[in-house]
Curated annotation (Swiss-Prot):
This is ATP phosphoribosyltransferase regulatory subunit. It is found in: Cytoplasm. Transmembrane segments: none annotated. Required for the first step of histidine biosynthesis. May allow the feedback regulation of ATP phosphoribosyltransferase activity by histidine. One of its GO terms (biological process) is tRNA aminoacylation for protein translation. It comes from Geobacter sulfurreducens (strain ATCC 51573 / DSM 12127 / PCA).
Length: 438
């Protein structure tokens, strides 16, 4: 018999197949996040995979426009885009489909976007987003809701050692505008401030014609990072009204976050330059210990829906699900997925009883698979272990009597006999599990 040669079936760079174990973990993460969103009164929207390029581009910054996948639509003759971010889609939907509905809109979503990545960057072109948008409220309370939900979702996933960095584009924008620097110089300075590169900031300022007072104001930005005391230092540094209003806004949000009980996870970074061309107020990013990239990010964007003809204040944030997956996989102490509960191993010729037991277990909410392939006990146990199944229930055979099943804990092979009548009773539970050899 001629051996079959496996075909080569490579994937494009920047995308991957997620096999059952990782797919389970992604579903687990998304489910935990969605539960928090729903508890806060947010309702799900499912956005399309395609948009007309000119429509989606109206809601994108220059960076995301450059990363958007485009192609010609055979039906309309127009340019089609695969969205590189879901928030502009939500803005379009609110401005058109939900225009007549009362405000505020509490919307959540979960989906994938595509972004071009630099050839040598090694970054994924496929991004899993789970996020919320609160549209129609311009208040510190709305901003505080976003931050609190981010904290609650991270705690729900089992994280304890994480921080949410709070910034405010109004603060840094006010200082930059008051400086009167040329746009090119301002962009260089913002990049250096964002990297916390103090020497580069000083070098750029040394070449500028600004007064010593203005230089001191700008040079202070990279060090305005820490706890609430940063606001006092920033108040001494900033002299313009825009920056002072931003500090007052952050202070109000912090008061509310203290009431929500999440202050222990907060830091303030007034040198944050992310989203200066997009955000309009408070911004934030979430970081988990051991991860260099943010696992969530968001903030206020009061001008986005106006680009679609419906001016409304808005705030929101999104989780990077794959970043969360990487963080969870580095933490063996954190549950990262829901494993399968039971594998039914039938050693009887008659299938009826095994089928009935499996059906009963599913009614009780236990995920239950049958090992339909005929194999021995050890091979079935090995299969259960490799498929990440917690328990194997043996029906028939030498391990149990005619009125019993044998329940095995897959992790260590320990098992116990259980009466079949108990399996069909309301008191049956897997919580305790086998605790002794029988």
């Amino acid at each position: 018999m001629t051996p079959i040669t496996p075909i080569e079936a490579p994937l494009p760079k920047g995308v991957t197949d997620f096999l059952p174990e990782k797919a389970d973990k992604i579903g687990y993460i998304e489910g935990k996040i969605r539960k928090v969103f729903e508890l806060w009164g947010f309702r799900r929207i499912i956005t399309p995979l395609l948009e007309f390029e000119d429509v989606i581009a109206a809601g994108l910054g220059d960076d995301l426009k450059a990363k958007t996948f485009r192609f010609d639509d055979r039906q309309s003759g127009k340019l089609i885009a695969v969205p590189s971010d879901i928030t502009p889609q939500i803005a379009r939907i609110v401005a058109t489909r939900l225009r007549g509905y009362p405000l505020p809109h509490r919307i959540c979503y979960s989906g994938r976007v595509l972004r071009h990545a630099e050839l040598q960057s090694g970054r994924s072109r496929e991004i899993f987003q789970s996020g919320v948008e609160l549209i129609g409220l311009d208040s510190p309370e709305a901003d505080a809701e976003m931050v609190t939900m981010a904290v609650e979702a991270l705690k729900g996933l089992g994280f304890r050692d994480f921080k949410i960095d709070l910034g405010h584009v109004g603060f840094i924008r006010g200082i930059m505008t008051a400086s009167g620097l040329e746009v090119a110089v301002r962009n260089r300075l913002q990049e250096a401030i964002g990297k916390k590169d103090v020497s580069a900031v000083r070098s750029i300022l040394a070449e500028s014609p600004l007064s010593d007072a203005a230089k001191d104001e700008l040079a202070a930005l990279p060090r305005l990072f820490g706890g609430r005391e940063v606001l006092d230092e920033a108040g001494r540094v900033a002299t313009n009204d825009t920056s002072r209003r931003a500090l007052d806004n952050i202070s109000q949000v912090l008061d509310l976050l203290d009431i929500h009980g999440v202050s222990d996870h907060l830091t303030i970074d007034l040198g944050e330059v992310r989203g200066l061309d997009y955000h309009t107020g408070l911004t934030f990013e979430g970081f988990v210990t051991g991860m260099g990239e943010a696992v969530c990010s968001g903030g206020r964007y009061d001008t986005l829906t106006a680009r679609y003809g419906f001016p409304a204040p808005a705030t929101g944030f999104t989780f990077n699900v794959l970043a969360l997956l990487s963080a969870l996989e580095k933490r063996p102490d954190v549950e990262a997925s829901k494993t399968r509960d039971i594998l039914i191993f039938n050693q009887q010729d008659d299938r009826r009883e095994a089928l009935e037991i499996a059906q009963q277990l599913r009614r009780r909410g236990y995920t239950t698979a049958r090992d339909i392939i005929r194999r021995n006990f050890d091979d079935s146990l090995d299969y259960a272990r490799r498929m990440n199944i917690l328990h194997m229930m043996v029906v028939g055979g030498d391990q149990c009597g005619p009125d019993e099943v044998y329940l095995v804990r897959v992790a260590d092979g320990q098992g116990q006999r259980i009466k079949k009548a108990e399996v069909f009773s309301e008191r049956f539970s897997l919580d305790a599990g086998p605790d002794k050899e029988s």
